């Protein structure tokens, strides 16, 4: 039997698998002719971009609910090796699987430098499990002795994830530490750049800065973290901040599986792909999502985001089947780019274009953000094969 293996079950991986199933259906390929298999380290599709939120109950979807109706198999295991010449992947269980075509969609991870104490005492919202660990830690602190340090959270990294996390935390902390005792919850956002939101551009920066003020979030810019301890952080300036919680949100890098391939990678560890999501220099392999640097237009590469990961997955899934059956491949181009950043109780900010010009803010932008987070980025959850395959069509959604 011919086999397509998809590594990863995030935004790109899920949609690559469903996209492949859809194209097989469209070509009327007989059942049992091509096996589409997802291999990932968990039996869930996680809505990773919501990990900063207080309520995580809707952030994890059983893969069986969305892959099963589409006839896609799933293996729960960590892929440890890719043999591109032999067309075989090996997992942490010792099992190996041959493939005729591979879609690499193993995502990215937060970069944690070898700082004293970070591995032992730091938290993150990079994964669902990490977000749950942070949530349980904060709940534990709220049930213990109430001190200023217990009610203080330091967030490191003032990019998009760091800003959303910092803006969400004041409300969570006030709810957790509501018994008072004269202790005021405190959130401090740290970044080595001279200002917060360095990637958001000049138009959005004043909106972000005002939102941080409105949320009561303190900032320390132009400094870095030198060390982390159970009681707080020491900054490069020499300042020490007493805090029982340090959340690391600084920097992302593509999955380490990309390092096993004999081709160049960009500064984020991503593979270069062509317009059809084929990995340049590696036969029979496609890549989508955070592991791939794909051209969105003549000037801009894809961004590590679900905004780009989902359509990259859909196109990769369609093209991997087209490639198997000598059908024309579809080029991916996305003619627009937006950013919708959650600012907690201060609303949100919505920007358009690669220069990130603000077009909406406050409550209207918040409504858009909530619509994205709770509806737009979800697969159909009604168990309908027809709905799942229809949603996996190789197309680019209009702006939210």
From Swiss-Prot:
Keyword Oxidoreductase: yes
EC number: 1.6.-.-
Gene induction: A member of the dormancy regulon. Induced in response to reduced oxygen tension (hypoxia), low levels of nitric oxide (NO) and carbon monoxide (CO). It is hoped that this regulon will give insight into the latent, or dormant phase of infection.
GO molecular function per UniProt: oxidoreductase activity
GO cellular component: extracellular region; plasma membrane
Protein origin, superkingdom: Bacteria
Family designation: Belongs to the NADH dehydrogenase family.
Protein name per its UniProtKB record: NADH dehydrogenase-like protein Rv1812c
Native species: Mycobacterium tuberculosis (strain ATCC 25618 / H37Rv)
């Amino acid at each position: 039997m011919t086999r397509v293996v998809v590594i990863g079950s995030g935004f790109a991986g899920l949609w690559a698998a469903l996209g492949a199933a859809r194209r097989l259906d469209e070509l009327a390929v007989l059942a049992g002719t091509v096996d589409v298999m997802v291999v990932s380290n968990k039996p869930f599709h996680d809505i990773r971009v919501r990990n900063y939120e207080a309520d995580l109950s809707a952030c994890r979807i059983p893969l069986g609910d969305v892959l099963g109706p589409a006839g896609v198999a799933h293996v729960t295991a960590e892929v440890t090796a890719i043999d591109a010449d032999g067309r075989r992947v090996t997992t942490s269980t010792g099992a190996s699987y041959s493939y005729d075509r591979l879609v690499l969609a193993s995502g990215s991870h937060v970069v944690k430098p070898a700082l004293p104490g970070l591995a032992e005492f730091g938290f993150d919202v990079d994964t669902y499990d990490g977000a749950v660990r942070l949530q349980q830690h904060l709940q534990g602190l709220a049930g213990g002795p109430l001190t200023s340090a217990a009610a203080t959270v330091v967030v490191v990294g003032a990019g998009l994830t760091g800003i959303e996390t910092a803006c969400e935390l004041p409300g969570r902390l006030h709810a957790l530490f509501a018994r008072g005792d004269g202790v005021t919850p405190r959130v401090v956002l740290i970044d080595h750049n001279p200002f917060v939101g360095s990637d958001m551009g000049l138009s959005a920066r004043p909106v972000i800065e005002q939102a941080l003020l409105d949320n009561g979030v303190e900032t320390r810019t132009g400094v870095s973290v030198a060390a982390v301890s159970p009681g707080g952080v020491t900054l490069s300036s020499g300042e020490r901040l007493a805090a029982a919680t340090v959340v690391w949100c600084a920097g992302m890098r593509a999955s380490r599986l990309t390092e096993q391939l004999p081709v160049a990678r960009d500064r984020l560890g991503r593979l270069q792909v062509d317009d059809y999501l084929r990995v340049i220099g590696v036969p029979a392999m496609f890549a989508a999502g955070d592991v791939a640097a794909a051209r969105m237009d003549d000037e801009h590469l894809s961004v590590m985001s679900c905004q780009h990961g989902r359509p990259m997955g859909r196109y990769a899934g369609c093209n991997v089947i087209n490639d198997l059956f000598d059908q024309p491949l579809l080029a991916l181009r996305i003619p627009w780019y937006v950013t919708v950043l959650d600012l907690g109780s201060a609303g949100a900010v919505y920007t358009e274009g690669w220069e990130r010009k603000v077009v909406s803010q406050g409550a209207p932008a918040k409504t858009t953000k909530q619509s994205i987070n709770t509806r737009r980025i979800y697969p159909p959850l009604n168990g309908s094969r027809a709905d799942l395959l229809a949603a996996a069509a190789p197309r680019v959604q209009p702006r939210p």
